Amino acid sequence: MVKILVTGADGFIGSHLVEELVNQGYQVKAFVYYNSFGTWGWLDYLSESTMKYVEIFQGDIRDPHGVKEAMKGVQAVFHLAALIAIPYSYHSPDTYVDTNIKGTLNILQAARELDINRVLVTSTSEVYGTAKYVPIDELHPFQGQSPYSATKIGADRLAESFYRSFSLPVSIVRPFNTYGPRQSARAVIPTIITQLLSGVNEIKLGSLTPTRDFNYVKDTVNGFIEIYKSDRAIGEEINIATQREITIGKLAEELIHQINPAACVVCEEQRLRPVKSEVNRLLGSNKKIKELTNWEPQYTFEQGLAETIEFFKKNMNLYKADRYNI
């Protein structure tokens, strides 16, 4: 049985990826961030029937020795561990360099030394910056509009360099905005939903005019797995996108209509990005992933939102809807 290491397994997308890999018959080694509480993030909420196929490795992606130890005995690595909050990257950019760039280098170097069969490095649509044309394909230029996106550009280019320099069998997976159950309330869809479910009538947001291309998390993780299964994807960088966009304002209107029609949106200054840092439009092309793999999105936006709302209704005790957390 193939064993796959998932870094960032304790996070939002990572925990869903662990779940789906087990469902598809893989053994999983889950790299989770060490903490003194002995908790495994969202993996603590997965079923016992899933977790019996999961081996936990507690460590820190910034430590090359621990990373290499974690990678022993696996055939493939799905590298998702990263710092992703854009506002926090304004606050602590050095930490983003250490985690996102050095952490990725640790994975690539260990994979090279251990002859790992496949490496998937997780990128982000933020590397493109505001769209210069749409739909955004993989040839679109990069623009570091935040310290976060700059570190992800750096990590991507390191991955490319290991493919070109050492023939490391790496693929760069570039999801557009992913949403779904277990997502942090820092993200826009959960922040709207949790505020609405808390009963307040004023929903605090930043800019309402940017557009985003939203992937439901189950489609995102299936994109990862289909890229892994395709040898044609080696050495490639590949978008996961729906080719549909919606403004943040329209998204808020839709969720307000579904949950609390009496609510309204107010713009809160602390939630605004600096003007030159705001990515105003993201609409991705999924032509390449469809050409190189068997991936097709299975969820409509309406279906994904319904499942997401249902999760938050049942788990509001896990969130602090009254606080803005960068």
Regions found by a protein language model. Give the residues of each.
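N-terminal Rossmann-like NAD(P)+-binding domain of SDR-like oxidoreductases, especially those catalyzing
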Residues: 1-178, 248, 299, 307, ...
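Hydrophobic "lid"/C-terminal helical patch
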Residues: 17, 192, 221-228, 252-255, ...
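A short C-terminal helix-loop "cap" of Rossmann-like NAD(P)-dependent dehydrogenase/epimerase domains
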Residues: 48-54, 166-169, 193-204, 230, ...
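Glycine/proline-rich active-site loop of Rossmann-fold NAD(P)-dependent oxidoreductases
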Residues: 153, 178-191, 198-203, 217-218, ...
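Substrate-binding strand-loop-helix patch
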Residues: 181-186, 209-221, 237-257, 298-300, ...
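C-terminal "lid/loop" region of Rossmann-like NAD(P)-dependent oxidoreductases
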Residues: 207, 236-238, 247-253, 260-281, ...
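Conserved C-terminal active-site "lid" loop/helix of NAD(P)H-dependent oxidoreductases
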Residues: 217, 237, 272-296, 307
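Short, hydrophobic alpha-helical segments
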Residues: 228-232, 259, 312-316
